[in-house]
From Swiss-Prot:
Family as reported in the entry's similarity comment: Belongs to the universal ribosomal protein uL6 family.
Protein name in UniProt: Large ribosomal subunit protein uL6
Gene3D superfamilies (UniProt xref): Ribosomal protein L6, alpha-beta domain
GO cellular component terms, A-Z: cytosolic large ribosomal subunit
Lineage: Bacteria, Pseudomonadati, Spirochaetota, Spirochaetia, Spirochaetales
Amino acid sequence: MSRIGRLPIKIPDTVKIDVKGNLVIVEGTRGKLVQDIKDSINVKVENGSVIVNRAFNDKKTKAYHGLYRSLIFNMVKGVTEGFSKSLTINGIGYRVEQQGNSLFLNLGYSTQFEYVVPDGVSVKLDGNTKISVEGIDKFKVGQVAAEIRSLKKPEPYKGKGIKYDNEVIRRKVGKSGVKK
C-alpha cells in the first residue's frame, strides 16, 4: 500500500463530499472543487472520512493512489482554509499596481508587464512591492504565483527580481577589479 494513499482524510463538519462515478465533488464554506479520478482508483466516504483504495497493484496505479489521496486532501483544505503564496519585488524602481483584475508590473524594462489574474484566484497588494496570491485551488494559486515570479526571476548578484517570501537567494560575489 502507498504510505500516503492508505491514510484516511478526516472531513470537517463544514465540508460536504460527493462521489459520482469518477468525479469527486468537495463543497465547503469557501467554494466548490471538482476532481476527475482514474478508473483504477476507488473513493469511498465512510464514518466522516474519505478512504482512497486502488483496484490493481501495478506501478502506475500505486503512484495514482497517493496522488489522488493528496489531491482530495488539498481540496478539503482549500474549501475550509484556502491557500496563499506571498511574493516580494526587490529592485530600484520595481513596483506593482492593481487595476481591476489586472496587475501592472514595472520591472526595469522599457515597458510594463500586464498580468491578468485568472478566475478562482485573488491577488492582494501590500504597498507596491508585496503580492499575496490567494484561492481555494492549490494548483491555481501556485501556478499564478509561479507565472508572476517568472516575469523577472531574482538574480544572484544584487537579488533584484520577484521572489517568494520564504525563498532564499544564493548570492554571488561580483567581479573584483585588478588592483595595481
